[in-house]
């Protein structure tokens, strides 16, 4: 019979070696260490305590299953009868510390969200029977509903105590595997709880009176980084076009507004929809810019006449130029070409009707 004072047959432990005893049913004088077959380790310190009892030390070569066996016919009793095969002794050597992985089906490690609680799963690399909720360290909240799904899987609910960073952790040497090895420290699980809605700090145009050839820089500043925002989809533009807004930090976004041609409208706004959120999933408000005006209808000439069109030497006539609306930048000396005469500088009281003498 093969027995051990250190472990029982079929056990798993982290003993660096085990003491073995080989007990014969009757006296034998030729049982030797070479009659013993082993796997997963080696024997040492073999000795006879009596003609029926022998001892040895078994040292495993590495983690895993080991066997100690005595085959049939390897020794004899005093009557020269060969032995029958012994019942094999089995032992598993495990010196590896168990590890625990912390995951969540609600969020990923490092995420930010507005979930009021998250589901946690603790998965051990091997079976343990003494892992408890008290082995888990948390900050920024509390655990509830702790339960074992199996000898390797445990679940719990984490509820944040307020907005901000939270951590879930398992320090080393909090529980053991079935071999008695203390666990190694888990990789910390981090989650940020955010249930405050993002706001719009400003939504402005660099120019609110746009004419032909003008453009304006549109600047949209959120209170925090946002996700899911696209100016092409989320901003409604009146009587103009807006380039796709860009950002370097997901907080401040800029684009260029170009007024549409042939438009005269004093009342225009940009409108922001509510389809964007902050990183926690909180939706922001709908806002608009201040009013901007557009005047891109080019002025036309209503009339350009001379009072007298049949002039003799020494005669003069009044020249009248009437625009469709007030103009700026007009100078008769620069803008009117005169043939066979001279034109005084034309003047106007309303920038619409201009007169001069030819």
What are these regions (language model features)?
Residues 1-358:
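Non-catalytic beta-sheet/beta-sandwich ligand-binding modules that flank or precede catalytic cores
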